[in-house]
Amino acid sequence: MGAASRGARYLRWAIVAAGLAAMVWGVRQTGMRPPGPENGPRPSSPPAAFGPTVPAPSQPAATPPVGMVWVPGGEFSMGCADPRGIPFGGNDPMPDARPIHRVRVAGFWMDATEVTNDQFAAFVAATGYVTVAERPPRPEDFPGAPAENLVAGSIVFTPPAEPVPLRDPTGMAHLRWWAYVPGACWRRPTGPDSDLQGLGDAPVVHVAFEDAAAYARWAGKRLPTEAEWEFAARGGLSGAVYPWGDAFRPGGRWMANIWQGRFPGENTAVDGFVGAAPVGRFPPNGYGLHDMAGNVWEWCADWYRPDTYLGDAGPDGRAVAVDPRGPADSFDPQEPGQPKRVQRGGSFLCSDQYCSRYIVGTRGKGEVASSTNHIGFRCVQTP
């Protein structure tokens, strides 16, 4: 474990000891604090317009792997225009999703749904794997922390009983709806008194980045790059706002599992789900992929930097990035010492009131050792 990661984890556990774990976790995560003017790069010129998505003339060479669909690859415009002002676009300008730039990816197989509890349980049964949330922290990794406070657990959404001002100028509103719960993990998603009964087809949650990567290796797969994920999420559409098109609710139908009601205390669940939905309950996109918006965040392989797209676009903004794998390291100016990977798709907690990252071109980020009850993943496979 590197010094930066070790220090970050010690700080998290030290604050757990003080009963304020959500403070550390919350500011590490996308959508958990109000946007600010320094949240990302400032392109020197207006973002390019979306160009057409041009699928590659590729066909899968074999029978589809179980539970996977073919994503043909091709060239597309990656990124997101400032969503403020569009219906349900939210209040965040999303500067790290610009400039919009051209990207080309090769074809690949992708899980049609997020990895489920049943699938993850099969992995654990076969390997004996223990997730980050289930591991008691080692004293040598957290010098000075009282032994009684080195307790395994994870972060759980806990709606407050009273309204919360989402635009709190202190940036600490999120402390009101996240709680560190000892014993919470993928097997016990809301704490030690919970279990997975009836949740076998729900997406596995409370998985840190290394947990997702370990499952992918066992399954003979890998985590998608950010470019692969966005190409797949767009489903062949060119510059659409959502994986299914530009209308938020076409024909009045809910197309994704996101928050309804006043966030974070009132969840009207008019889409039928209070938390994560069983996978595949909402319509697929053009490539046959379900839940590419909402439900649970999905880990990608790339390190996170807010200026990644500036490099991919080239000096004149006209470059075509071919199968980009992301930057060599992580840097988030909000938290320079925290190593973060990209997360995509948003979750059941996303709302235009606070986190509109169900918009297909927007980006998320997560500290690599963090796990919560709204973070999961899906895998890809190179043919």
Question: What residue spans do the PLM features occupy?
Answer:
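Compositionally biased, intrinsically disordered low-complexity regions used as flexible
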Residues: 1, 16, 329-333
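Short, compositionally biased
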Residues: 2-193, 210, 342-343, 367, ...
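Functional-site microenvironments in short loops/helix caps that host divalent-cation chemistry
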Residues: 41, 70-71, 77, 81-83, ...
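Short coil/turn motifs at beta-sheet boundaries
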Residues: 370-372
